[in-house]
Regions:
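A broadly tuned preference for mixed-charge, low-complexity surface segments
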Residues: 81-97, 128-135
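Cysteine-centered iron-sulfur cluster-binding motifs in ferredoxin-type domains/subunits
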Residues: 25-42, 67-87
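Short histidine
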Residues: 9, 39, 78, 130-135
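Acidic/histidine-enriched, glycine/proline-rich intrinsically disordered or flexible terminal extensions
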Residues: 113-135
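Ferredoxin-type iron-sulfur electron-transfer modules in oxidoreductases and energy-metabolism complexes
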Residues: 4-21, 44-70, 76, 89-121
Length: 135
């Protein structure tokens, strides 16, 4: 992926918003990629956790919002446990999900699910999915 960074693409406001939502300082990331190596979901993501942190450092939240990565994150905290800088990357992913949902963009429509599928799924899974994927 080619990424061009200019003074116009860097959004200080977006960086501050992400830091506030997550309670983390994304600028502390040194791009070691330990998070990517530890993540069990990396193969399913279109951007690696390291790339998410890289884009977050420039405040490119719109680009991150178009990615499936924050939705594929299992919030298992494997990345957080091994991060040499102590960044809770799972919190950053949750903050990205919250940012996207605040724009009223849903990733799942409850009424579109077939009734037989709803009947066979555990209720806790449905609640978790709706909480995570709808605004």
């Amino acid at each position: 992926m080619t990424l061009t960074i200019t003074a116009q693409t860097i959004s200080i406001t977006s960086i501050e918003q992400l830091n506030e939502l997550s309670g983390e300082n994304v600028k502390l990331c040194m791009q070691c990629a330990t998070c990517t190596g530890m993540c069990p979901m990396t193969a399913e993501m279109d951007l690696s956790p390291r790339m998410v942190m890289h884009l977050a450092q420039f405040g490119m939240l719109d680009r991150l919002g178009d990615s499936n990565t924050c939705w594929k994150c299992a919030s298992c905290h494997a990345c957080t446990v091994k991060c040499p800088r102590g960044i809770d990357i799972a919190k950053v992913m949750e903050a990205l999900r919250q940012h996207v949902l605040r724009t009223n963009k849903n990733y799942i429509e409850p009424s579109a699910l077939p009734a037989e599928r709803i009947a066979e799924l555990p209720q806790i899974a449905l609640v978790a999915a709706f909480r995570k994927l709808t605004s």
